[in-house]
Each structure stands twice: as structure tokens, then as C-alpha cells.
Swiss-Prot record:
Native source species: Picrophilus torridus (strain ATCC 700027 / DSM 9790 / JCM 10055 / NBRC 100828 / KAW 2/3)
InterPro entries, per the entry: Class_I_gatase-like (IPR029062), CTP_synthase (IPR004468), CTP_synthase_N (IPR017456), GATASE (IPR017926), GATase1_CTP_Synthase (IPR033828), P-loop_NTPase (IPR027417)
Annotated binding of CTP, by residue: S12, D145, I146, E147, K180, T181, K182, P183, T184, Q185, K216
Active site residues per record: C370, H496, E498
Subunit-level organization: Homotetramer.
Chain spans, region Amidoligase domain: 1-259
Binding site for Mg(2+): D70, E138
Record function comment: Catalyzes the ATP-dependent amination of UTP to CTP with either L-glutamine or ammonia as the source of nitrogen. Regulates intracellular CTP levels through interactions with the four ribonucleotide triphosphates.
UniProt cross-references to HAMAP family, sorted A to Z: PyrG
Gene designation per UniProt: pyrG
Protein name: CTP synthase
Binding positions (ATP): G13, L14, G15, K16, G17, T18, D70
Length: 534
């Protein structure tokens, strides 16, 4: 078994997850069976209850696990489905150890960080990596953080039983035009003080590292120059595997592991070329409540990148604060499409309802996801059914028209963590609908994360107003997809299609939105050139 451990130094946010994902892609396409493991040192059991402002998007796996957004990167780059076992947190480790202690598994021993916590960490790593040739382990946080210490010690101990390559992500800042190596030197020194000497350094910088800088880093860190990889800024993360490949990272790893008989099958050439040189572009508004931290919507951003890579249509995202739409819809005036993503809590909901109405009334291509699906129902109920004050019981428990209501099985749930309708669920698609044309299938499986649904008492009235519920759950009780009978560019889904979008297999509904946005843009151009203003 081969392990590649990725740690980070100097500062957080250097892109360990993207580097890990890119290296995984190269190794997988060289013929290795590869998996990724993310270690998150926080005491939370999982990411499910974390504020997106602090932690970014909560990513949902097929098995319903709510995990760090880096696992979304892993799935996209590896084109695979991971499980909750691929995300190790301090909360999971301590919960397991304490439960075992209460059960008497330690036979009266004093339970300590070493060996009991570190052994639990190693057991979980081995469980998640079983059956693979190489497992890449990303240790969250920065070397030296007190929360990370047990995990650093655990991955250090791996070397006694398995082949381990230690890699370290550092920062090489540029000051007055000179690339500075001191932060990297000190970060490696800190890592060594914990018993780990890195074999590879991934050096983040604005521009490619100069040869003299690489030689200097090599001299002071004892990492060979061939193991120092310049990770400079690029336009799109899907260009990174090619940058690594050009610097010989695969040859270095193959030599280190003694597996030199694999040849790379680089499948992204056309995909990356379309991202670099798109033929056309569209402007799409994402109307959200967490737009100050765009990582809260990273899977939507990546889904649009996947569409670009497959079509050559670039997506210029306009980040629109939902609350600002309460005063003016000016930010929606010149866009070719509108996406209303998921979210929780009342703040921003009325702005999202305004966005849904603006798209419907102006026939602008629209995609609603999760809450974006629910606000479409609320908006149509208010505007077309005349149900003034129609709402979701999530936001107004006393509304006269609860067109969105809590799932029956959720009504007595008190805990927030891991209790929603989560994970991959079957969706049945009706014939003769836009959804059927998009998916070309009667059955799909998509990931969910919600507590509320369309109230069955209002379905018939909504359908009479022109709503088509073109997708349902397998019992045909829960509504999953909404479209309108008088157009083909308005669709909303209860599920999160963005979570299953992949570079070479983009989300079908994101693809549909972009294609309809381009059609809308071309129509506007034709009208303008004919003397009709937008």
C-alpha cells in the first residue's frame, strides 16, 4: 500500500485540496487505483451544521454524508463516488474512542492520545484505503495547529508499516519582484520538528518559480529539485494537472514507489482547451445569501466550468445578494440566465422569490436548486394562484397557505446534524417533458439535502396554473422537478444536481441553463440589431 500525505504550512487556503485532487487525477489516469481521504481537525462530527460563511459549501455524498467541500473536488477530479469513510474528523475519532472506552474495549487501560487516538486515526485511514494502490491523505489546517497534532503523529507512524510519501504545500510570496523562500524554509523546519521530512514540496506562488529559487529551496530543505513543484496561479483549477505533469511529478512518484510501468492517459486536452479559449459567453446571475464567500457555492461554479469545458461557452457569473433585490432588480437587468441555489433560514428568501418572479415574468432562463425550487412554488402560488402570503412553514409557521411544508418524517426531529433527507435518491421523470428531454432517461439518481417539500394539498392547483411537476420520487408522492407549460427555459429541482457534475459529464440542468442562456442572448442581440432595445 502506498500513501501520499499532503500537509500545509505558512498559511491556510493555499489550495491543498486542489493540489491533492490534481495529483489524484494524474495517478488514476496512469493506471493506479486511487482514493482520497480528507482529515478535518475540527471537533464537529461532520460539516453538516457548519456556517457556510466560515467553512464554505457543505458537500453531500451518495450515502448522505455531509462533508468538507474538498471531497467535492476529489469526486470531480477522480470521477468517482466517495463515502463518509473518506472524511475523518476529530469529532468522529473522539466519539468512537469514547464509545469503545465505555464499552470496555480498552480493558481498563488509561485512554490517551498516543496510542489510542492515533491508532483510531490509522485504523480509519486503512479502512478507507482498503483495495486501492494509492491513497492520498490531505491533512486539513496548517502544520503547528494544536488541533492537527494527533493527526500529524498518526500519519508519521504510518511509515513504520507502509510506504509513505510526505508532501508539503507552502507559500513563496513575491515582494518587490523577488520570490522569498524563508516562509517555506521555516514551514519545513516546523514539519521536521514533528518527525516528518517532506519528500515533495508544492510551492504556491503568483508566477512560476525561478530556477535559482528552486535550487535555494532544495538546498535548505533537503528536498531534491525534481521534488519541488512550482504551483503558480492559473485561470482555472483544471489546468493544474497539466502543470504538474510538465514538471515531472509522475516520474518522481513512480521512481519513489518503484512503479514505473504506468503510462498517463491524459483525457482533458479538449476540455481544458475549451476553458482556455471559449468560443462564446453568457452572463448568469447566482442569487444567494452567502455571496461574500463564493466557496459556499463552489459546486455550482465548478458545474459551469464543466459546461464550458464541454461546449466552449464561458459563463460569467454575476454574484447577486438576494437581500438587495428587495430594493431594486437592477442587478438582474443584463443577465442571460438566473440561478437560485439552496440555503437555510429566512434571510434572503424574499429576494430569491423576487428573482424567481423576475425570471418568469421576463422569460429569462431560470434554474432553481433546492430552496430555489421551493421559492419558485411560493412565487407562483402568490402571483398566479392569488394566494397572498403563501410561504414555507420553515419561514412562516402561521401562513394561511403553507405551499411548502415540513416532510412528515421530519416533524418530530429535534437534532440538526445528519437528520435531513440526505443522499442519493431515485427520481422518476415523466414523458413529454423538458426534464425528459434534458436527461434522456425515465429514472435518475440525484443527491438531496432538505427537510421541506411541496405540500401535496396544493399540487393540483399549481398544475392548473401551468406548473408541470415533471419529476417525482419513486412513490410519486414527493415533487422533485418543476417546469412551466408555456416555455422550455424555466426549470427547478428539489435535488442538488451540482453535487454530481463532473468535468466530462456536466450537470444536465446546468448545461440546459447555459444553452438556453446562449439562445436568449442571441435573441436579444438579434432584437437589438433590428432596432429593438433590451
Amino acid at each position: 500500500m502506498h500513501y501520499i500525505v499532503i500537509t500545509g504550512g505558512v498559511i491556510s487556503g493555499l489550495g491543498k485540496g486542489t493540489i491533492t485532487s490534481s495529483l489524484s487525477y494524474l495517478l488514476k489516469n496512469s493506471g493506479f487505483k486511487v482514493t482520497n481521504i480528507k482529515i478535518d481537525p475540527y471537533i464537529n462530527y461532520d460539516a453538516g451544521t457548519m456556517n457556510p460563511y466560515q467553512h464554505g459549501e457543505v458537500f453531500v455524498l451518495d450515502d448522505g454524508s455531509e462533508v468538507d467541500l474538498d471531497l467535492g473536488n476529489y469526486e470531480r477530479f477522480l470521477d468517482t463516488d466517495l463515502t463518509g469513510n473518506n472524511n475523518i474528523t476529530t469529532g468522529k475519532i473522539y466519539k468512537s474512542v469514547i464509545e469503545r472506552e465505555r464499552h470496555g474495549d480498552y480493558l481498563g487501560k488509561t485512554v490517551q492520545i498516543i496510542p489510542h487516538i492515533t491508532n483510531e486515526i490509522k485504523e480509519r485511514i486503512k479502512r478507507a484505503s482498503s483495495g486501492y494502490d494509492i491513497a492520498l491523505i490531505e491533512v486539513g489546517g496548517t502544520v503547528g495547529d494544536i488541533e492537527s497534532m494527533p493527526f500529524i503523529e498518526a500519519v508519521r507512524q504510518l511509515r513504520s508499516t507502509d510506504d509513505v510519501i510526505y508532501s508539503h504545500v507552502t507559500l513563496v510570496p513575491e515582494i518587490n519582484g523577488e520570490q522569498k523562500t524563508k516562509p517555506t524554509q521555516h514551514s519545513v523546519k516546523e514539519l521536521r520538528s514533528l518527525g516528518i521530512s517532506p519528500d515533495i514540496l508544492f510551492c504556491r506562488s503568483e508566477k512560476p518559480l525561478g530556477k535559482d529559487v528552486i535550487e535555494k529551496i532544495s538546498l535548505f530543505t533537503d528536498v531534491p529539485a525534481s521534488g519541488i513543484i512550482s504551483m503558480y496561479n492559473v485561470k482555472n483549477v483544471y489546468m493544474i494537472p497539466e502543470i504538474m505533469m510538465r514538471q515531472g511529478i509522475l516520474e518522481y512518484i513512480k521512481k519513489r514507489t518503484g512503479t514505473s510501468n504506468h503510462n498517463l492517459d491524459y483525457t482533458w486536452s479538449n476540455f481544458v482547451e475549451n476553458i482556455k479559449n471559449p468560443a462564446e459567453s453568457v452572463d448568469i446571475a447566482i442569487v444567494g445569501k452567502y455571496i461574500e464567500l463564493q466557496d459556499a457555492y463552489i459546486s455550482h461554479k465548478e458545474a459551469f466550468s464543466h459546461v464550458t469545458g464541454n461546449t466552449g461557452i464561458s459563463v460569467n457569473i454575476h454574484w447577486v445578494d438576494a437581500d438587495k433585490l428587495l430594493n431594486s432588480t437592477h442587478d438582474l437587468k443584463n443577465v442571460d440566465g438566473i440561478l437560485v441555489p439552496g440555503g437555510f433560514g429566512y434571510r434572503g428568501v424574499e429576494g430569491k422569490i423576487i428573482a424567481a418572479r423576475y425570471a418568469r415574468e421576463n422569460r429569462i432562463p431560470y434554474l432553481g436548486i433546492c430552496l430555489g425550487f421551493q421559492v419558485s412554488v411560493i412565487e407562483i402560488s402568490r402571483s398566479l394562484l392569488g394566494l397572498k402570503g403563501a410561504n414555507s412553514t420553515e419561514f412562516d409557521n402561521n401562513t394561511d397557505y403553507p405551499v411548502i411544508d415540513i416532510l412528515p418524517e421530519q416533524s418530530n426531529v429535534s437534532d440538526l446534524g445528519g437528520t435531513m433527507r440526505l443522499g442519493s435518491k431515485k427520481v422518476l421523470i415523466k414523458d413529454g417533458t423538458i426534464a425528459k428531454n434534458i436527461y434522456k432517461s425515465d429514472i435518475i439518481y440525484e443527491r438531496h439535502r432538505h427537510r421541506y417539500e411541496v405540500n401535496p394539498d396544493y399540487i393540483e392547483r399549481l398544475e392548473d396554473s401551468g406548473v408541470i411537476f415533471s419529476g417525482t420520487d419513486d412513490e410519486k408522492i414527493r415533487m422533485e422537478i418543476l417546469e412551466l407549460s408555456d416555455r422550455d427555459n424555466y426549470i427547478a429541482t428539489q435535488y442538488h444536481a451540482e453535487f454530481k457534475s463532473r468535468p466530462l459529464n456536466p450537470s444536465k440542468v446546468h448545461m440546459h441553463l447555459v444553452l438556453k442562456a446562449l439562445e436568449y442572448r442571441r435573441n436579444i442581440y438579434e432584437r437589438n440589431t433590428s432596432g429593438i432595445s433590451r
